[in-house]
């Protein structure tokens, strides 16, 4: 089979399963409204949970940062790309979340891959929740260590896997809020079992940071858990992009020496770091509390209105509210019908989610209003 035949066969298989991913160019897509092909839609596919992507103070901070530092960092942080803006953001994140150090990464995917690649050796073992993000599972699969997966949020299964002999160290990996189901991990129980077996805990809290807990400190703070490795991302609650790893000083020093994604990547622009500092300030003050409270009320309104629909509603109290349809083609058809009626909703299909669980992944944000939720419910009931 030639290269072209191999590529064609893979694409044909995706098409046959109604699983071919497509991109849609949008003129505006992060806020309450999405604009595409000169039409405006209510946007229920954005991860901008607090509605900060268009916040005037954050936009102004980025503009002022670009005027001061330029539009790029100019290099790796180990060469010339680590600015006083990066340093200030790291210090503010560490203070906010109660860690000694924070290290910035260009994306959450890069942060997860970097930590696992740098930390794990052949004699070690990763024990990951089966529904962990692709970046975590791919990094674990590519690492020299053994990968074992425990049933989703099943602490008993986790304990059984940790109890089996391991010549090296064990790292337990999970998420705070799961990206496709929107449910939360029982972090306190997971940490207790992990500590009983002398392991370390790594939590990816991409969908909890900024959105839940006191001052938006996220899932771990809410559950009074402090994992050895905490990954936070800035493309969701912060409304920007990028990520950070929170850890001890010695682990930070270690990652600065051995995390290749840090050493060999251009740093995020300093202007972006300035925007993130402004976003963090909003998240921490009363305005952040008000946005989180509004989001909670929107979620409650939505969940109360979908109980009698013929779909499976995931057990989620987060901004991620999946309606599980099951069949790929049915999910695609339903998403298209909703778009035709002015609601931009995305159908998520295997391999992103398990076979037979194709869904509409609805996301609610503080930028929405109650009438937006009511319109979404009206359209869903009309097509249920």
UniProtKB/Swiss-Prot annotation:
Biological role stated in the UniProt entry: Catalyzes the decarboxylative condensation of pimeloyl-[acyl-carrier protein] and L-alanine to produce 8-amino-7-oxononanoate (AON), [acyl-carrier protein], and carbon dioxide.
GO molecular function, one term: 8-amino-7-oxononanoate synthase activity
Reactions it catalyzes: 6-carboxyhexanoyl-[ACP] + L-alanine + H(+) = (8S)-8-amino-7-oxononanoate + holo-[ACP] + CO2
InterPro entries the record matches: Aminotrans_II_pyridoxalP_BS (IPR001917), Aminotransferase_I/II_large (IPR004839), AON_synthase_class-II (IPR050087), AONS_Archaea/Proteobacteria (IPR004723), AONS_Proteobacteria (IPR022834), PyrdxlP-dep_Trfase (IPR015424), PyrdxlP-dep_Trfase_major (IPR015421), PyrdxlP-dep_Trfase_small (IPR015422)
Annotated source species: Escherichia coli O139:H28 (strain E24377A / ETEC)
Pfam family, one: Aminotran_1_2
Iron-sulfur listed as a keyword: no
Source taxonomy: Bacteria, Pseudomonadati, Pseudomonadota, Gammaproteobacteria, Enterobacterales
HAMAP family cross-referenced by the UniProt entry: BioF_aminotrans_2
Cofactor: pyridoxal 5'-phosphate
EC number(s) given by UniProt: 2.3.1.47
Chain positions recorded as pyridoxal 5'-phosphate binding sites: 108-109, 179, 207, 233
Residue numbers of N6-(pyridoxal phosphate)lysine PTMs: 236
Designated name of the protein: 8-amino-7-oxononanoate synthase
Family: Belongs to the class-II pyridoxal-phosphate-dependent aminotransferase family. BioF subfamily.
Known partners and oligomeric status: Homodimer.
Record pathway: Cofactor biosynthesis; biotin biosynthesis
Binding of substrate, residues: 21, 133, 352
